[in-house]
Amino acid sequence: MRLTFLGATHEVTGSCYYLEAAGKKFLVDCGRAPGPNSYETKPIPVPASQLDFVLITHAHIDHTGNLPLLYAHGFRGPIYMTPATVALSDIMLRDSAHIQLAEAEWRNRKNRRAGKEDYVTPYTMEDALGVIRLLEGIPYHQRVTLSDGIQIRFLDAGHLLGSASIELWLTEDGVTKKLLFSGDIGNIHQPLINDPEYPESADYVIMESTYGDRSHGPKPDYVPELAKIIQETLDRGGNLVIPSFAVGRTQEMLYFIREIKAEHLVHGHGEFPVYVDSPLAVEATNIFRDHQKECYDSDAAALLAQGINPILFPGLKLSITSDESKAINFNETPKVIISASGMCDAGRIKHHLKHNLWRQESTVLFVGYQAVGTLGRALIGGAKEVKLFQEEVHVNAHIIQFPGMSGHADQEGLLKWAGSLRAKPDRVFVTHGEDKVTEIFAEKLWDEFRYPAMAPFSGTVFDLKENEFIEKTVGIPIQKETTANAGTLRTRSSGNAVFDRLVAAGQRLLTVITRNKGGANKDLSKFADQINSLCDKWDR
């Protein structure tokens, strides 16, 4: 009964944990790190084909993004998550694969001009579609037996539609240990979704620490602030452009705008048009509608009881096709445009910025975190000119950033969640935070509750039955890592993605051979002949 820490150790992204218990091998989360890491991430200790199943906390790519790669390497087991997470993961994994393939096409055009070999993507759209077929939904609060000695239950983490903390009971040789994986713990009083549920007990807690060193401060009243910005922008004859993450934040903005329209807080512009210009955001908005009953909070549920959809309203226009998107900027009516990506580095938002940044009448409103090096960060930093589609664009529009909008609990919220445990856990492992933040929050857990807490590095292995470390690693700094390889699944690698895929296929074949032990001799003989025929063809 052991737990191995792989991703999001002293890092914020790439969550992944490997467990062995009750004769099974499985992962909790299988996330992609979209940017360069500070420390090396250890590989999954076994071939993907030997994993029995995967548990997922929520649909964000830093928790699910390597699932298609796991499939490409031979994994074919079930992947358990909440029903809403199944729906969101479906569209987000397809979207991620599409972006990867589009990037590969662009890179290969450059490579061919330079006489270089084609870049081969780590996985294909077929792999993404294949892994989506493995997704299985388990509702909140149902304690489910996955196999002898392994039970799970999902609690609402309040971070994203369908997000969960995972209670995991492991039994071996008559000894049962309960693990609690926090997932990403949500901020309180977010629109639409419930606040985080508070756990009661666990022997071991694996806990996020994204904002473990800070407070969000007093929460502004966003509705009157947003109404004021809309009023002033439309009065000038401009457009309000809102770069927004397609899943979660876009739906929050629709919730606020519905209230603004219902309360008639914007005057003189009737049912002013609001465009959601992102196919992914449109699909996500439909998923929010389909999962109202199990995921919406009491305020949203009260609106539904009155026959009011919390995120739909007169004047809302959902743009899906490229032609529909282009038409938005040829319509001179002052409007609100919500589009992805939230940091302005990709997607249709770049077209809307090109058409509006130069206009003094328009406003660009940022409602999410802007990472260093992104176009969004440059704009909130006061850039006077930016490059879009190889053109220099002057920044004359009003640039505004909403403070305090976060889907993550701050230090106070994290402590409230951890402090809800009725008995002191044997250990708390702090992950999913920047290097120093994980250490700060581990110390805070000791100071506040006398919880024995520590922040493990990737590769650390812990014996859950004996409550002791099997291997305790230190962080190995990465000198230089490019964005291109930062998101790859950590497996034993030759450095050639195509050859690694072949090796993974061979490992899967060995797993399938082992599982056929005890089969009918006639079938085993046929299987052996097929393998030998394949070997004869390729043995050169």
What residue spans do the PLM features occupy?
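Generic long, charged, amphipathic alpha-helical segments
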Residues: 379, 387-418
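Charged, amphipathic alpha-helical linkers/stalks
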Residues: 459-526
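Hard-cation-handling environments
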Residues: 229-374, 387-389, 437-439, 444-447, ...
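Short, surface-exposed amphipathic charged segments that create phosphate/polyanion-binding patches used
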Residues: 150-154, 287-295, 415-416, 465-477
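Short, solvent-exposed amphipathic alpha-helical segments in soluble enzyme
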Residues: 20-22, 43, 168-171, 196-199, ...
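His/Asp/Glu-rich metal-coordinating catalytic cores
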Residues: 1-55, 60, 64, 71-252, ...
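Short, compositionally biased "basic patch" segments
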Residues: 191-206, 292-299, 370-396
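C-terminal, active-site-flanking charged/polar segments
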Residues: 359, 434-479
